[in-house]
Amino acid sequence: MNFRNEKDFEDLLVAMLPTVGWEDSVLENYDEARLLQNWADILFENNRGIDRLNDFPLTNGEMQQILEQVKELKTPLRLNGFINGGSVQIRRDNPEDTLHFGKEISLKIYNRKEIAAGQSRYQIARQPRFSVKSKILNDGRGDVLLLINGMPVIHIELKRSGVPVSQACNQIQKYAAEGCFTGLFSLVQVFVAMNPEEALYFANPGPEGKFNPDYYFHWADFHNEPINMWDKFTRDLLSIPMAHQLIGFYTVADDSDGILKVMRSYQYQAANAISDKVSKARWEAEHLGANQRGGFVWHTTGSGKTMTSFKSAQLIASSKDADKVVFLMDRIELGTQSLKEYRGFAEENEDVQATENTSVLAGKLKSNAPADTLIVTSIQKMSNIRNEGEYGLNAADLEKMRSKRIVFIVDECHRSTFG
């Protein structure tokens, strides 16, 4: 379909989004103040209970407390932790709530596991109005903004047929330079640049970050066939549940370099397939000797295998489909490097455990502590855990380890022959 003007394209996109899981009602021309009130209304509906808002709405002062926390965090990386942390604390200043007045309460803002369920809300804001830093510039208007539970998390810029998608990327970059993605709009995690024949998506680099076209990605299907047409792209990536999962599971706040990352389509396909495989595993004793095949993460050099393997492990751990996920390395230096990367990818409430020696590894494999779920070790250390009496292990220890549901992710498995 050929679009001679951008408005026709925008009309059709906005009409299509409700067919893939977004709400029918569209927020037209909302500025930050109106979007903040919309967020307040959703927070109230999702937190009316006696232990939270006690059926008394949020005041402007309480919403400003939340907005100040957003402004203080500032970067998309830290705000990713805010969103996926699931809750926010405020001090009640609504005098009508005599039970909580002057006290701190916790409000639920988002649950990445409540996908198209529970209290999740999916809204479309059309032509959102941005305030710019400079007094001599007019305030900006975006094309389409997608909100989850009132938070703007995906911003879309459109261009008509015949206009390169790079111009939509440039428009996003221009808005960022003018200070449009600050305040409430700094919650945006992912940008989408789209014309009818091509679409790109990329992580928000933040106010001090750099827009790098090397990290503007095309989406692709399971067979890595590119999905360029706007309608197929919308159905695949911007639909619910996928958009919810993209924000909750397939963005990575990398503390090692301070940059928010979004996974490429092949990384998503691999991590999702691995997690799905583990969810269908049969752990009963009669099935353990059966031919339950695993799989390979088949990426080229430099294409993000480490992130894919970590995200696979994180998904498995989050789903509780295994008790332990063990990253096996065939060289000590690889283990040290990978441990650093995995810890960079890990969220604030996640631990990635090192194993200084075989005894430490054995202790973590026996442990029931949630902090000991993700473990990095070497094939050499793992191969040492075989016999009773070695490394202080007794029959009960070995049996305890055997009773665990353990998933192994082997780095460079094509060349790992030891053990």
Question: Where do the protein language model's features map onto the residues?
Answer:
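ATP-dependent helicase/translocase motor core
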Residues: M1-K324, M329, E333, Q337-N349, ...
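Short beta-alpha junctions and helix-cap segments that line functional grooves
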Residues: S312, E341, N357, L361-K364, ...
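Conserved helicase motor
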Residues: I332, A354-K364, I379-N384
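Short, charged, low-hydrophobicity "junction" segments
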Residues: E347-V360, I409
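Conserved motor-coupling elements within RecA-like helicase/translocase cores
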Residues: T358-I375, K400
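Conserved RecA-like ASCE ATPase "motif II neighborhood" in helicase/translocase motors
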Residues: L374-E412, S416-G419
